Amino acid sequence: MKKNYLLLNFIVLLFSMTFGGYALQPTAADVYTPTVTDNEVSVFLETPFTNNIKVYAWIDKNTLFTEGYPGDKMTLMGTNADGTANIYKWTYNGDKKGVPTGVIFTENGNKFVERDQDFVNHGYYV
């Protein structure tokens, strides 16, 4: 009976840690070195911000490469070498031809830079 009681306590502990958020806490992101393939349309953003990072990219007002403003969510890839900023990547997965000409980066809908920026394929923005 004592073995069953210990097993039951262990299972309850694991369950509470897992679903209570204790066992699955994220660890510090790994240092990331940007990588691309020649045929992809992508950009990188280095920023200390972590909340709802998005990219808005276009050729003209009729040719958007992202969802409507503020755009598509960027993927957290890791950190810079000294760990002071996160590196995000966005890769276009649609069927439009060409490469965007303009880009805006946002956090929670707020622009990082007040003006539109030129889009550079595989560009690294800081």
Where are the predicted features?
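A short, solvent-exposed beta-strand micro-motif common in secreted/extracellular proteins
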Residues: 98-109
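Low-complexity, acidic Ser/Thr/Pro-rich repeat tracts that form intrinsically disordered stalk/linker regions
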Residues: 23-38
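Structural beta-strand segments of beta-rich domains
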Residues: 39-43
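Aromatic-rich carbohydrate-binding modules that target alpha-glucans
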Residues: 48-96, 110-116
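Extracellular beta-sheet/turn segments enriched in Thr/Pro/Gly and aliphatic residues
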Residues: 30-34, 117-126
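Flexible, charged surface loops at secondary-structure boundaries
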Residues: 35-37, 95-99
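Bacterial N-terminal signal peptides that target proteins for export
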Residues: 1-11
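Bacterial N-terminal signal peptides
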Residues: 9-21
